[in-house]
Amino acid sequence: MANLGSNQGATKPMTFEQIKTDQIDRVAIVTLNRPEVLNALSLQLVRELDEFVTDAEQDDSIGAIIITGAGDRAFSAGADIHENRENNDEQRAAGAAARADYTWHLAASTKPIIGAVNGLCYGGGTVMATSLDFLMGSEKSSFRFLAVNYGQLNATWSLPTMVGWPKAKELLYSGREVFADEAYHIGLINHLVPSGELMDRTVEVAAGIAKNRSEGVANIKSLLIEHTGNDLETQFWTEIEGRKERFKGLSVEDGFKDFLNRKGRKPRVS
């Protein structure tokens, strides 16, 4: 594969702490860079990703974006539960608002965004993944839509557009794991390739899109969103509002009790 550090055509250097950014010709590559915690989505990471996409939308040298995870274990294990647990109610509300904004930003971005799912993709990781235009995967890819296990709502607006309503219901109701072969057969991932070829193949597919006129791709994407269920954005924000109303007052300890007990983490005392 071409040198990921080339940054050919980038309009300006950008420095981040929790994501890495590279560019190959007209394809930008964003790596979620917290492998020590399976690329858990901290608020800082989410904001950095949102900032990068905002900048990329104004960059004529970028025709497509790829998002992947650092390391060989995970695309993303989901939200950073421990960070959320240690925040107060005001911080959690601000974090939830920021996550909602960035998720819709990814879904509606004027640039096509492809996910290269290099490992497990759980919880909030699946929310991010299903908000992208489409996904590439390997034999290491696996998915779990875990919101139901914590009494939460996620991906009700996005997953049905990828796999259809009956399959989406099964996966959202059960929270069971979906391995690579099944993910490919149900349409959750578009291409299933050997793990050693995943990034090469994803760059190849992205380059095939990026060579086209950016405004043409953006117009197609915008119209597809408009046509999906008539108003996909309304479906998205209905889920966000439903989350607020249905789970008002639910503490992190209550919502993620099994996870926190399994990890054996104690609350941080300040």
Residue spans of the language-model regions?
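Terminal peptide-recognition signature
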Residues: 30, 34, 49, 67, ...
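Glycine- (often His-adjacent) and acidic-residue-rich active-site loop
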Residues: 69-105, 121, 267
